[in-house]
Amino acid sequence: MAKRTKKVGIVGKYGTRYGASIRKQIKKMEVSQHSKYFCEFCGKYGVKRKAVGIWGCKDCGKVKAGGAYTMNTASAVTVRSHTIRRLREQIEG
């Protein structure tokens, strides 16, 4: 198997094709989609991507919907923080 260089990492499989800037964008996506994420249910780093937008924990078996390349999208994080703030205000006042 061919050795990838330190610089290009996971996108070394594309060689010199497609241009440098596109390979940099693809590297960011592929690194995030292949990494493990923290499971909110069991508290371990065991969540991996199963398919586009489907993330599953190997430890507790929970399946969660998320983004295509990352587990949490920016809009989902915003909605969640607003919801938590609204619920906290309802409890307090």
Curated annotation (Swiss-Prot):
> What family is this?
Belongs to the eukaryotic ribosomal protein eL43 family.
Q: Where are the zinc fingers (C4-type)?
A: 39-60
Q: Which InterPro entries match?
A: Ribosomal_eL37/eL43, Ribosomal_eL43, Ribosomal_protein_eL43, Ribosomal_zn-bd
One biological-process term from Gene Ontology? Answer: translation
State the name under which the record lists this protein.
Answer: Large ribosomal subunit protein eL43
Q: Which UniProt keywords apply?
A: Metal-binding, Ribonucleoprotein, Ribosomal protein, Zinc, Zinc-finger
One GO term of the cellular component aspect? Answer: ribosome
Gene3D superfamilies to which the protein is assigned, alphabetical: 2.20.25.30
Gene Ontology molecular function terms on file: structural constituent of ribosome; zinc ion binding
Q: Which domain of life is it from?
A: Eukaryota
